[in-house]
């Protein structure tokens, strides 16, 4: 009896060994448990159930944190970055992209091999071989063309064979995507892309997980594993940008009175699912101006009162979808309980559009699929309206005279006026004539009266044409104006000419005074007889004779001019 029990235990253990050894995709990729009805309702075209067995011999499974991950790649670890264009409207496509980030100084070349980058320093000593992994040449490359048992390793984890490569284009990475209890396997290079349709997916956040393997001889080893959350919604994903001309900060949702606000609706539709759908916009600005309905995604609105207003926008469109059951069973169309409130993401007001049982799903599958379902998108914001600076104008520009002119410096006075609130600061930006390249920026606090009249003095370096930008601001607004200013050149010779003119005038005046003095002196001079000056005459005669002898060598030609006066004494 004991031997019989031992045999039975042995048989049970032997029968259980294959079950324990055989791994499934859900054991490798994720441990989320999905109910059977979710698996049936969230079927993805081209995807397989994660209940399939995983070929652990060809694709080994490593637990997170094992030391083997460190040696899975030459020169460091490979990181995988997973992104998606979530959120996605039900019925549209959502795309996932995986990009591999190699260790420093490594990249993928045109043939799919991993090589070292040139002129890139690495912590490791680079060998003479430029390849990190050379998959183009070698014995493994011949297996792609071999259909015998030697190429049996060219298959996915579930045993399906690899697709035939086109030409010499090879893919050396295996990507396995997993979500909603299903998986999709694909070959790729350093990047892989997968798109799925969300027509049958459950609304709400979901998880996408990806594991990446690389070629390693006749097997594959994991190099990276990553997951990301994506969202499926039955609301139209929208975002509204609000802009106002003189608003200082549009992100705080505080705007100015008596200036139009520009509203622009952005619909997140990367798969262009709504391209052929008519979209209507219902605007309610909360200031008792009524409801505006338009087919344009932009609109301007001006608030004329200060205060806080609730802005509401509703976007509506009709999209293709499954038709509702024509005769829903009374047992399935139960009314909601009073304690449960409808979700704000509910886009279809009719409860018959929501599948409530397996039977209604079957009727929907066999019914005509040319129905359209209304989808809605909502945006709400609290807008605050305050007073602000509405307008700035330059009314006068004047040159400031400088006592000592400098050729490289000119001063200009600007008279600036504004409308609206009183500014607390003024900024001046001096730029080139195109108003593109700023040369000088000066900001300073200002104290302005109720008339908002401001005088600003600014210096300019050299002559030429400048673009001057004046900005007046307070806590909520920022108004500006610009003008082109021409600065004339300074005449460096004008001071010298002024000094020379003054000196010449003074010289002429001195000569005139001297001449008048001489004339007056001669006119009023007292007469003195010659006889009383005998001594002086004798002395004068001796001096005259001396001068005559001194001039004789230089003026011989003039001796005959006065022959009768030679050797004769002077007589007056």
From Swiss-Prot:
The keyword Phosphoprotein applies. Could be a melanogenic enzyme. A motif (Cell attachment site) lies at residues 556-558. Coiled coil: none annotated. GO terms for molecular function: heparin binding; integrin binding; receptor ligand activity; syndecan binding. Residues 23-500 are extracellular. Residues 1-22 form the signal peptide. This is Transmembrane glycoprotein NMB. The modification Phosphoserine is found at residue 544. Gene3D superfamilies: Immunoglobulins. Glycans are attached at residues 93, 134, 200, 249, 275, 296, 300, 306, 312, 461, 469. Residues 321-359 are annotated as: Disordered. It is found in: Cell membrane; Melanosome membrane; Early endosome membrane. It comes from Rattus norvegicus (Rat). It comes from the Eukaryota. Residues 522-572 are cytoplasmic. GO terms for cellular component: cytoplasmic vesicle; early endosome membrane; melanosome membrane; membrane; plasma membrane. It is a single-pass type I membrane protein. Belongs to the PMEL/NMB family. Residues 330-356 have a biased composition (Low complexity). The lineage of its organism: Eukaryota, Metazoa, Chordata, Craniata, Vertebrata. GO terms for biological process: bone mineralization; cell adhesion; cell-cell signaling; negative regulation of cytokine production; negative regulation of G1/S transition of mitotic cell cycle; negative regulation of T cell activation; negative regulation of T cell proliferation; negative regulation of tumor necrosis factor production. Keywords: Cell membrane, Endosome, Glycoprotein, Membrane, Phosphoprotein, Signal, Transmembrane, Transmembrane helix. Disulfide bonds: none annotated.
């Amino acid at each position: 009896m004991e031997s019989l029990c031992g045999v039975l235990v042995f048989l049970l253990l032997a029968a259980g060994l294959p079950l324990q050894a055989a791994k499934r995709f859900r054991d490798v990729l994720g441990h989320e448990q999905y109910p059977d009805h979710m698996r049936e309702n969230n079927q993805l075209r081209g995807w397989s159930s994660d209940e399939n067995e995983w070929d652990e011999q060809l694709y080994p499974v490593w637990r997170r944190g094992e030391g083997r991950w460190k040696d899975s790649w030459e020169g460091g670890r490979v990181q995988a970055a997973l992104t998606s264009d979530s959120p996605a409207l039900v019925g549209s496509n959502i795309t996932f992209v995986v990009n591999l980030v190699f260790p420093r100084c490594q990249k993928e070349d045109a043939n799919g091999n991993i090589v070292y980058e040139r002129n890139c320093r690495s912590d490791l000593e680079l060998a003479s071989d430029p390849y990190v992994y050379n998959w183009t040449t070698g014995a493994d490359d011949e297996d792609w063309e071999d259909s015998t048992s030697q190429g049996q390793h060219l298959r996915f984890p579930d045993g399906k064979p690899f697709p035939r490569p086109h030409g010499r284009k090879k893919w050396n990475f295996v990507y396995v995507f997993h979500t909603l209890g299903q998986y999709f396997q694909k070959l790729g290079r350093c990047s892989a892309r997968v798109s799925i349709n969300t027509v049958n997916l459950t609304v709400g956040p979901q998880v996408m997980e990806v594991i990446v393997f690389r070629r390693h001889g006749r097997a594959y080893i994991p190099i990276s594993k990553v997951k990301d959350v994506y969202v499926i919604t039955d609301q139209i994903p929208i975002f509204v940008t609000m802009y106002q001309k003189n608003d200082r900060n549009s992100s705080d949702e505080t705007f100015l009175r008596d200036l139009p606000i520009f509203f622009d609706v952005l619909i997140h539709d990367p798969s262009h699912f709504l391209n052929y759908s008519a979209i209507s916009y219902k605007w309610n600005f909360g200031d008792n101006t009524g409801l505006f309905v338009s087919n344009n995604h932009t609109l301007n609105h001006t608030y004329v009162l200060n205060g806080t207003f609730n802005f509401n926008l509703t976007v509506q469109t009709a999209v293709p979808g499954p038709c509702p059951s024509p005769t829903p069973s009374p047992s399935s169309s139960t009314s909601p309980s009073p304690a449960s409130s409808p979700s704000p993401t509910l886009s279809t007001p009719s409860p018959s559009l929501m599948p409530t049982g397996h039977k209604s799903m079957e009727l929907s599958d066999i019914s005509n699929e040319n129905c359209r379902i209304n989808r809605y998108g909502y945006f709400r914001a609290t807008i605050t309206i305050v007073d602000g600076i509405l307008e700035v104008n330059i009314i006068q520009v004047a040159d400031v005279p400088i006592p000592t002119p400098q050729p490289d410096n000119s001063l200009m006075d600007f008279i600036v006026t504004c409308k609206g609130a009183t500014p607390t600061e003024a900024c001046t930006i001096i730029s080139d004539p195109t108003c593109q390249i700023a040369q000088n920026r000066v900001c300073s606090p200002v104290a302005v009266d109720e008339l908002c009249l401001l005088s600003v003095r600014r210096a300019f370096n050299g002559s030429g044409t400048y673009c001057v930008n004046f900005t007046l601001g307070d806590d909520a607004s920022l108004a500006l104006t610009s003008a082109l200013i021409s600065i004339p050149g300074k005449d460096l010779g004008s001071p010298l000419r002024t000094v020379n003119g003054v000196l010449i005038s003074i010289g002429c005046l001195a000569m005139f005074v001297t001449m008048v003095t001489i004339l007056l002196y001669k006119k009023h001079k007292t007469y003195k007889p010659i006889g009383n000056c005998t001594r002086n005459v004798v002395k004068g005669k001796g001096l005259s004779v001396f001068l005559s002898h001194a001039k004789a060598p230089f003026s011989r030609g003039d001796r005959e001019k006065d022959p009768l006066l030679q050797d004769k004494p002077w007589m007056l």
